[in-house]
Amino acid sequence: MFRGILDSVPDIDTIHIGPTAYASKVLDTDGNITATLVTAGSNRERVSYDQLPQDLVNAFVAIEDERFWQHSGIDLKSILRAVRGVVSDDDSAGGGSTITQQLIKNNVFGGGLHEGKFQRYVRKFQEQYLALEIENQPGLSKEEIKKSILTEYLNTINLGANTLGVKVAARRYFNKEVSELTLSECTVIASITKNPTALNPITHPEHNAERRAQVLKNMLEQGYIDLVENLLAVTRIEGGQVN
């Protein structure tokens, strides 16, 4: 059975792990943008890794995949924790998918929609296989691969109300460029991706605030921020910033 599952895995040389749908810009004869054309699933603008504030990168890693910089595509500790959560019916245990696996799920397997239970298990196994393949490509350093994965992930994710990717989210929620986001604003955006509808900071600010508290707690525990930065971010969040 496992041989058949592996035989049906997409070839790593033919897949594209990044998003393909982006908003289109209309320019005048002087090269100025006069309009932005957006269709369903394309309200996205590309951002490079160098344009991402470090707090945003750290916030997503802290809440989504704390061992991202260390693992090689899959995280056995997270998988075991997730299994224990399923067995004990503990929703707070979290999922077992790494950021790499989430990216593959979204851009290679179409988000895993309309799957039966068996198909879901097959897809999960194939995600893990591809994640290992992608993170262990020859000719690239571990850091280069990790930065590329994070860039594609942060350009891909659904951040509520047809807001795709962090660049559009920064404008949507804070009316600023992604590179200008503060720590507290970064945690607002990082909090959305788990459930873009229920955690939308405009329509469900109280739910987003609860998730943001967890993001900040994780960042503090993982050494990305100190206690003073944590307290300042909480204060700014409570003051209200979302447009």
Model-derived features: where do they sit?
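Non-catalytic structural connector segments
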Residues: D226-N243
